[in-house]
């Protein structure tokens, strides 16, 4: 049962773009253009596809405001917000790994300097 549950979770968690979109929506509602800037090197086509997929899975809601010009914002649903602790744990692990990697790199440089 656990393996099946892990596979289900990884269908979402293994997608880099969706995790970055989630990260940015945890701070509040965002327009597509704001998300594109925040996420970084993502095409509009890929961003739109991921937003639609996340909406289809109930992780975010698309809100259309009847203004001129038309304004569309995305916000996390309650289900989407349940991923916040998961993202926090991933961030903590990433920070820990980054620190370990820096120490390993520094040690390798010192070793190379000592043995040259």
Protein language model features and the residues they cover:
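DNA major-groove recognition helices of helix-turn-helix
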Residues: 54
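Amphipathic alpha-helical dimerization/coiled-coil segments
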Residues: 5, 23, 82-116
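N-terminal helix-turn-helix DNA-binding core of bacterial DNA-binding proteins
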Residues: 2-46, 66-73, 104
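Residues within the DNA-recognition helix of helix-turn-helix
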Residues: 50
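Basic, amphipathic "hinge/linker" alpha-helix immediately C-terminal to the N-terminal HTH DNA-binding motif
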Residues: 66-90
């Amino acid at each position: 049962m656990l393996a099946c549950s892990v596979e289900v979770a990884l269908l979402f968690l293994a997608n880099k773009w969706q995790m970055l979109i989630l990260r940015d929506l945890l701070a509040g509602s965002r327009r597509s253009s704001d998300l594109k800037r925040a996420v970084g090197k993502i095409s509009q086509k890929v961003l739109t596809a991921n937003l639609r997929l996340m909406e289809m899975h109930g992780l975010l809601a698309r809100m259309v405001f009847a203004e001129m010009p038309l304004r569309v914002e995305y916000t996390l649903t309650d289900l989407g917000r349940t991923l916040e602790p998961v993202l926090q744990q991933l961030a903590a692990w990433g920070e820990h790994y980054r620190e370990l990697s820096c120490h390993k790199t520094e040690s390798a440089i010192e070793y190379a300097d000592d043995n040259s």
